[in-house]
Amino acid sequence: MNFKFVVFALILLTFSFFLHVYIINILSEIYQTKEKITPKTLYYEIIKYSIIYISLFTFSWLFSSSLYSVIYFIGFSYLGLIINISMLCAFYQIIIKLIPLSTFSSKILTIVIPILITIYSLIKAQIVYLQEESIVCNKYKGSIKILHVSDMHLGAIYQKNSVEKLVKIINEQYPDVVVITGDISDGSAKVESDWMEPFNKISDNIEVLYITGNHENLYGKKEIINEINKIKKIKYIGNSDEIIQIKGINFIGIDYEYRNAIKRAKNIINKNSIQNDINVLLYHIPNISLQDLNEAGIFLMLAGHTHGGQIFPFTVLAWLGNKYFTGLYNNDNKNYIFVSSGYGTALCPMRFFTKKMIGIIEIKGRN
């Protein structure tokens, strides 16, 4: 696990205690207690529980990976619960001004419903949704099946069993190519070699291409690439000008660190004189417009990063902050962007109003 991730995680978890000030004040209003809670009155409690959690977190990180995974899961599941309670408390403050609520109804709204949402979200984060899309390309003579996975976030929660589940789906779907568009790990724990080993069980005729995302750059790209290079089945293409051609389709991979990805893509396309070919770009962040992609000669871009917002209210924020949020986007049938909402999760192991997604994209010629 990268030290930067530890610092970030602990700051985030410590900050979550301040949400308790808001929550406790709302609950004290519902339960009609007299004491008003302020950050100052909780100051020592915040420090006490922060020290306890930090001690457990650090001890398990140093001495027990299995205990660390349990503590990580509990800590960030709890953070998700606190976020859910905070959102319902905010909703309570709005609705109470419009509709009088009994004490019983208020308790249901601010306690029971958030707990049910949290349980549902934890379960939903484990259910894989296959999003199938069919794209017609007039100048293409054949057909190709692409399986797109992004944001696996291998680490404290998602480990070898997550990869095994993915490989099983890959072999069942039997695509021509699998593309992994970044964030294969999240820095929450060191990626062990045996976690990656199941990738070698992918059927022989299936190509596997990989590029990096922002998490690899933040928490140890070199170490991840070293592990990827040990897996013969995976071809890392994010840091070269190499074009991978599969069934008449050119695949271009660009790592997250190349912030001006469209410029790099144009250079690769021009260098290889493939402007009029069918080109597929793999890039982690969906921040390139369909128009710019079309001008560069890119028929399809595959991306991830957004997680579909993962949990409320971040689903709304991600939707507002990303022109290409999740799913397939069409530029009058000229070219396309497909954004995966991700296979893993970041921090809170939960999903609400979004899906654990694997994309199945078929490109075919017009009959």
Language-model features, listed with the residues they occupy:
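Non-catalytic terminal accessory segments
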Residues: M1-Q126
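N-terminal signal-anchor transmembrane helix
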Residues: I71-I74, K97-S150, G155-Q173
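Soluble catalytic domains of enzymes that build or remodel membrane lipids, polysaccharides, and related
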Residues: V136-N367
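Generic serine detector
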Residues: S16, S28, S50, S55, ...
